[in-house]
UniProtKB/Swiss-Prot annotation:
Keywords: Amino-acid transport, Cell inner membrane, Cell membrane, Membrane, Transmembrane, Transmembrane helix, Transport. The keyword S-adenosyl-L-methionine does not apply. Belongs to the binding-protein-dependent transport system permease family. HisMQ subfamily. Its main location: membrane. GO terms for cellular component: ATP-binding cassette (ABC) transporter complex. It comes from Vibrio harveyi (Beneckea harveyi). SUPFAM superfamilies: MetI-like. Pfam families: BPD_transp_1 (PF00528). Probably part of a binding-protein-dependent transport system for an amino acid. Probably responsible for the translocation of the substrate across the membrane. This is Probable amino-acid ABC transporter permease protein PatM. One of its GO terms (molecular function) is L-cystine transmembrane transporter activity. It is found in: Cell inner membrane. Residues 19-210 form the ABC transmembrane type-1 domain. It is a multi-pass membrane protein.
Amino acid sequence: MGFDFNYMLELLPILLKYLGTTMEMATWGLVFSLILSVILANIRVFKLPVLDQLSQLYISFFRGTPLLVQLFLLYYGLPQIFPFMVGIDAFSAAVIGLTLHFAAYMAESIRAAIIGIDRSQMEASLSVGMTTTQAMRRVILPQATRVALPSLMNYFIDMIKSTSLAFTLGVAEIMAKAQMEASSSFRFFEAFLAVALIYWGVVVILTRVQIWAEAKLNKAYVR
C-alpha cells in the first residue's frame, strides 16, 4: 500500500476543524502560565521566605518530570486522593497540566530577564517616589518582557505542539482525530503527516509573529 497523496489532501480540512480546540487549549495554557510564572519569578527575585523554597521545589518538579506523566497524575491520579477532582473534564485537565508544566520554565526565563535589568533602574524608580510594586510594573517588567519575549514565544510554540498529548486524556483535538482516521483507513503515514504539516504551518506563522513583535519592541531601543 503506497503513499496516497489525495487521501492526505482530503484529510487536511477534516483535521483543520479541530485546530480551534488545539489553539484554545494552548491559548488558555499560555494565559494562565504567564500569570503563574510572573508570580513565581517575583517570588524568586525577591527571595520571599518559605515561598521561595516552595517555588524552587515546584519548578524543580515540573521541569524534572515528563509532561505526559504530569497529565496522567493530574487527570487519573489526583481524583483518587481528592474526590472533588473526580468531575474534572479532560480539556480542563489538559489546560491545567500545560499551565503547571510551562509556568515552571517561563518563570525562570522571566526571573533571568528581571535580574538582567540594571539594578540602578529600580533605585532610580524608588528615588522618585515609586513603590517597589509600581517600579516593577512600570519600569522593570516592560523591559524584562522585551528580553524574555523570544524564550516565551518558544515556550508557547512548544505548548502548542505539546497539546498533542491531550488526546491521551480523551480530548478531541487534531491528534485524536488523526488517530481515529488512521485507525479506520490504515493510512497512518498520511494521517500523521497531515498533522505534522498543520503543526508546522502554525509554527511558521507564529515564528513570523515573533520576529515582528521583537522588531516592534526593539524599535524603541534602536538609536
